[in-house]
Amino acid sequence: MRKRTFLGLLGVSAAAMAVSLPPAQAQAPCGTTALDEVKKRGVLRAGVRQDVPGFGSVDEKGRIVGFDVDIAVELARRLGVESELAPVTAATRIPLLQQGRIDLIAATITHYRERDKVIDFSVGYFWTGQKLMVKKDSSIKSLADMAGKRAGTTAGALALQNLAKAQPKAVGQTFEGYPEAFLAMQRGLVDAVVADVIILAGLRANSPKPDDYVIIGDSLGGGDYAIGVRENDSKWRDAINFALQDMWKDGNWDRIFDRWVGPTSALKLTKEEIGFKMEVWD
């Protein structure tokens, strides 16, 4: 199945999108669903990250690659259509979905109640907790040490909210993406990066000196990554759920995991360490 990538949404803020993008049909016409639209179009438009190594990042050939990307491409293949990748950020992914610019979100988005008020979600396809990453020689060894310290992350990330609950005296600072937050820590502009553990592991693995950074502290919370879809479209959500569950049953999820996250990947994690098992229905 041919994969197409468009990069026209790079660096666009949520506010700017609302102004600059042409009007889009956020809801399918009466009597149709997103599944009907995707089938008719012949293309599945997936919102993916390009700043999360291992899940969605740009390789040396300029292609967006990663775990989430492979999941989205495999979903398209199982639906019998092509895939088109739209770069999104934590701040832009939900607005783009609501505006009808993309058909789904496959972009390290955690399913939790506040988000469920505005979009719907598939079954989970990955699980991760949230922690802090600091320089190895940092005096910060635990959440208690973050009092008065600066933690960087990306706008719209759940981790910053959880940090504020766990350590109210920590000072949060947001950046355009996780690489920018990581760079800020390297330059001493923030004292730590707070994010999903899998994201922190990817940033560390892709740095020139991975051993210079450590992931510390108790988990700030965690949850399933799931596919985000527009509300009230059960036919579309079911199609995605069944495809994800079939991937789990036939071994394709394992193949994608091993390629991007497993012991032979840059992240070098095992399924036991992740502790994830997909909800599969008979």
Predicted regions and their residues:
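N-terminal twin-arginine translocation
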Residues: 1-5, 14-26
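Ligand-binding clefts/hinges and TM-proximal coupling segments of bilobed small-molecule sensing domains
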Residues: 27-28, 158-175, 212-213, 244-282
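Extended ligand-binding regions for polar small-molecule ligands
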Residues: 28-29, 70-78, 150, 157, ...
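Extracytoplasmic small-molecule ligand-binding "clamshell" domains
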Residues: 28-108
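Short helix-initiation/N-cap motifs at beta->coil->alpha
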Residues: 31, 85-95, 138, 157, ...
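A ligand-binding cleft/hinge motif common to bilobed small-molecule-binding domains
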Residues: 92-95, 108-117, 162-165, 191-221
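Periplasmic-binding protein-like
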Residues: 126-134, 197, 201-241, 263-282
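Flexible hinge/capping segments at coil-to-helix
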Residues: 134-151
